[in-house]
Amino acid sequence: MAYPELDAADFLQQLARRKEFKSLISPPVDQKELIRDLRAHFVQIGGPGCEKGGRAFFPCDPYASPFPSIKGLQLHNAQLFVQNFQNPNTPYSRLLLNWQTGTGKSIAAIAIARQFMNHYMNFIENAPWIFVVGFTRAIIQTEMLRRPELGFVSYKEVAELHRLLHIAKQSGSTTSVESRHLNGFVSTLKRRLTDRNRGGFFQFYGYKEFASKLFNITSKGEEKNFDVLSLFHRSDEAEDTLNENDISQFVQKISEAETNGLIRVNQKIMEQLRGGLLIADEIHNVYNIQERNNYGIALQYVLDAFPPHQAPRAVFMSATPVTGSVMEYVDLLNLLVPRHELPNGQPLQRQQLFDSSGHSVKWKKDALALVERLSTGRVSFLLDTNTNFYPERIFAGKMLSYKDEKLPYLHFIECPMSEYQLETLKQLGPDPKISSNAYSIYDMVFPNPKFSKQTEPKAYGLFNSTETPTALSMASTDWLLENGVQIIEPSRRAPFNVSGSFLSLQPPTHISGLAFYSGKYTQMMKDILSIIRQGRGKILIYHNRVRMSGVLILQEILQSNGILNEVSSPVGTTRCSICAAIRDDHTHSDHQFIPVRFTILHSEIEPAVRERSLALFNASSNLEGHQLRILIGSKVIVEGLNFQAVRYEMIMSLPLDIPRLIQVFGRVVRKNSHMELPPSERNVTIYLYVSTTPDGGPELAKYAQKLKEYILIQEGDKALRKHAIDGFTNQIKIDKPMLESLPLSPSITPANVGATVLNTFEAYGYGEQEVKTISNIIISLFMARPVWTYSELWKAVSTPKLIQGITIDNKLFSEDNFALALISLCYSKNQCKELWIQNRLCTIMHVPAKPEHLYVAAVLNHKKEPVLDIETYIRDFQPPTMHSIRITKYLEHSQTKEPFQVLYEKFQKDFQDEPMEQVLIHYPASFHYTMLEALIIDNLAGMGALVEVYKKFFIAFSKKDIQPFPDIFKIISHVPGDDNTLVGYATEDSVRLITSREDKTWHEIPLYMLNINVKRKENDIVIGYMESKGKALKFKIRPPIQVLKKNEITDIRMLNRGAVCETRGREEQQKIANQLGISLNLTKISAIKLCLLIRNNLLQKEMEARNQPNGMQDGIRWFYLFNDKMPSLVHTS
């Protein structure tokens, strides 16, 4: 066997010596030394002193990164390691990726899968399948379809996908033509992954779906209420625990149940998995003791049902493989280690690893050594806190003690319970046990209708989720008013919730406010206001629950203290996102009032709505949080969701355990999550709130208990990782104590790896991959420096970390492979490798010279021939192109659209004598957006009348228009031109402001920052708008939204969404015209002309409404123009 077997005494040593693994030891390099290397090779392209460091070959940016880089996705060393380890050429059957959150587990799994797919493509028939199972399967699919480097889509298809995504977003509707185009395109790409006739090898399942499709309960089984779990769990125990006497027989038991006609195993799935690959994400979910399910049973069955040589290979992924209980190690190891390699060939049982007495559990003697032995060669472990890529994690607060014992790792914001909370807690007795329906006591209590005044002696609050809704719902109206409580109308998503001034920091004098009912939430609100006053930065608030004291009440607390949801309009008590002052008291002259807004994510919100809110929160235009400052999330955010540029995380309740708490931290501390922020702001401050009493309190006791359990889990984690396959490559990252890991000293270190072994490197094609890597490095070096000698180039290529993103050990590169890479890039008459270098189309030329041959980045002329002379690297020989105005990213997609140049010529011809306002309704959005950018960037002559129309409708903005908004004016103040110079225009979602005409760069701000309200009230008569119908734009009308909402529609087909005006009945057309005040003899006018009159009248009224004082904020809506977002019309009854 070319690779060592796992049971070899020196397995890790043999593995580490092979070049495909040894080269992934990232050599330590001092930053100052690295800058010296850059300057020695004259390739510093940015940073202080870059012109000198780069010999001024090309313009450089002193504020940019100094390192040349390779465009596109580059697998990091850990991803390359597992790709090389778990592939068809190695004998290793199962692997756990135990990687810190945000380090690229999904990309690693896809890279592994790609190797197997390439192998399966050589099968003539009965090729196996790759199964991807998990709650985050959609994320993995998304990664596959947005990364052309992974080999599932082309660069052109990714560009088309981005274009369709943008157009669909601009349409504002999930049922629009644009959205249907997008969905169709995505479906086509996804079918390529799963349809064998199209070259697909993948099957995607959720855990529940996989288990239910694998085990089909027959009608006989349903009659007998058969449950697959009954084969594996004792029915006579209170807790759901594995029946260890039966688990070793579970394959046989399934067969018996199948013979008895109770169950039918899906043989199609079994055959697809035979010799295939199984990828299971967030593997801890399949055996979590606290959440009973049959997910793990299904996985265990498909892994154990085959003979070893036919069983599927498996890749498991989790940042926290053991969560709810340390005893889950038994279940993890049974999945990770093939049955025949376990002790005595039988599944592990808990008594083999643990001593338990009551609720006390501890590791048995030698149990950790057994974990070390069984996990050798089956675990990849990665921690990464490199602040070049990850934000710094800062914990606010202090460490606390419980019963004189210091709690390890965590810092807390201590929140003493209010007197009312303490009085309520007394009702549970001296040593309270908090049941699952009493969790609100940790956070707050609610007013109790049993007491007319909550301040009277011995009064106590409500907290039980069964009793509280009933008691408050039955309270009298007078009591509710007296105590500042408002019952929110129940809905499917929120059967019960309350609001009112009792949640305010500053309630009316006769009402007890938030501080009376919750010390924790009072401190949270104070911290939020303090953060806002300190400056910019987005905030994520986490609570494990939705109802009672969970995210729904947090939403009401924010609203009761002047913070708006996504759609509400500001009022006098609304707070400013910049200074936290309320609107009525906002006297700051240095900034405009911008309301603080929040959004909310929980499992009962529709996925499409969650995705939209998340996208807005993460958008680059919301980097400072001025569109959405705060996101409140429940446990739905713990896995699979990523948040960008969050500066503050507030954790209001402990998730089920400490490993899940680590997952919550990982939502906001992710690789490159803060790269758009200045370096000084690339950090996340974490606030961990805990309610306390004079003797500690039940919530602190809960943390103390979970931390004790976590210490046991950490001991198991350390044993699991002791012989990690890549420990020797990650030594400097894993040898420090931290919350995620005890300090770990790998059994193999970089210093004792030994001599390099090349046999598998050369046999399995890694040399070809090295040639590709070197080629990419060469191209990057030529982008920084246009002329090299052979020896200079080889020295630069073999210098570690000279290229950003390449962290392998370049010193192990073969010079033969370097020569091959260089030859493959050099120009020949039969082959021209085209490169874009500093926006010039170039190729690399080999120039024979003495004493040493030169290699030059030569510019290509219009015939694609290299032009080589002393100034070749600065001469710009680009192929001649027709001059045309730039088509912007707002160009809408439709095969029937005419090119802009054609429409432009038509516009010049048609509107010589016509009212210029008509241009707004005769041309599509693509024309207008392109025209607007041409007016702003190219300053087209003879367009004064059109500019005035755009300005009258508040579509285009001059410097003068922006001056009343000082903070915004700073963005464009440097742009050349007088007060009347156009500097921006409005789209459906934002205002685009030009920042550089030369570079064609733009800055986007929300519409509301220029007092543009996208949800102006509609008039009570009729609404007009234009819609594309083939090449034509059709005028359509519909009733106003408020009229639609009043109508009781029982059949969704009768919902009046709008129709072409000419198709309306004559009576309806005349009625609308009369209501609009069109005073003509309508009986003698054709339907077409009547609709033209209605259209022009609505357009005129729209212009007049917009030009009223504050018209773009409060004016009545009559007509939706090309850049207006139409409201979604849906049936809600």
From Swiss-Prot:
Stated induction or repression of this protein's expression: Expressed in the late phase of the viral replicative cycle.
Binding site for ATP: W99, Q100, T101, G102, T103, G104, K105, S106
UniProt xrefs under Pfam families: Helicase_C (PF00271)
UniProtKB keywords: ATP-binding, Helicase, Hydrolase, Late protein, Nucleotide-binding, Transcription, Transcription regulation, Virion
Keyword Nucleotide-binding: yes
Location of the motif DEAH box: 281-284
InterPro entries in the cross-refs: Helicase_C-like, P-loop_NTPase
PROSITE patterns in UniProt: HELICASE_ATP_BIND_1 (PS51192), HELICASE_CTER (PS51194)
Family: Belongs to the DEAD box helicase family. DEAH subfamily.
Its biological purpose: Putative initation factor.
UniProt protein name: Early transcription factor large subunit homolog
Taxonomic placement: Viruses, Varidnaviria, Bamfordvirae, Nucleocytoviricota, Pokkesviricetes
